[in-house]
């Protein structure tokens, strides 16, 4: 037996295409490219998209702990204090319909 029949040759090539294998024999340089394309893309690898923790979950958790008095966020405390002092001085943002444009019309 010298080689495969035409039918067997075409079927082997078709099965290689279906199952993501190399259809024709290639050199090592081309096999490197085939190997790169057969791997998952960088964006779909778990270590890439799971690199940073879920910010929304942690922010909600820390805010809940802050309101319960179990966590102290000095920066947020400072911002709240500044907002409170601004309101006492009468410098807070006007409510909707009470701004400069609305005052002109009255």
Curated annotation (Swiss-Prot):
PANTHER family: MITOCHONDRIAL RIBOSOMAL PROTEIN S33, SMALL RIBOSOMAL SUBUNIT PROTEIN MS33. The keyword Oxidoreductase does not apply. Its main location: mitochondrion. GO terms for molecular function: structural constituent of ribosome. GO terms for biological process: mitochondrial translation; translation. It comes from the Eukaryota. GO terms for cellular component: mitochondrial inner membrane; mitochondrial small ribosomal subunit; mitochondrion. Residues 84-94 have a biased composition (Basic residues). Belongs to the mitochondrion-specific ribosomal protein mS33 family. Keywords: Acetylation, Mitochondrion, Ribonucleoprotein, Ribosomal protein. Residues 95-106 have a biased composition (Basic and acidic residues). Component of the mitochondrial small ribosomal subunit (mt-SSU). Mature mammalian 55S mitochondrial ribosomes consist of a small (28S) and a large (39S) subunit. The 28S small subunit contains a 12S ribosomal RNA (12S mt-rRNA) and 30 different proteins. The 39S large subunit contains a 16S rRNA (16S mt-rRNA), a copy of mitochondrial valine transfer RNA (mt-tRNA(Val)), which plays an integral structural role, and 52 different proteins. The gene is MRPS33. This is Small ribosomal subunit protein mS33. Residues 82-106 are annotated as: Disordered. It is found in: Mitochondrion. It holds the Pfam family MRP-S33. The modification N-acetylserine is found at residue 2. It comes from Homo sapiens.
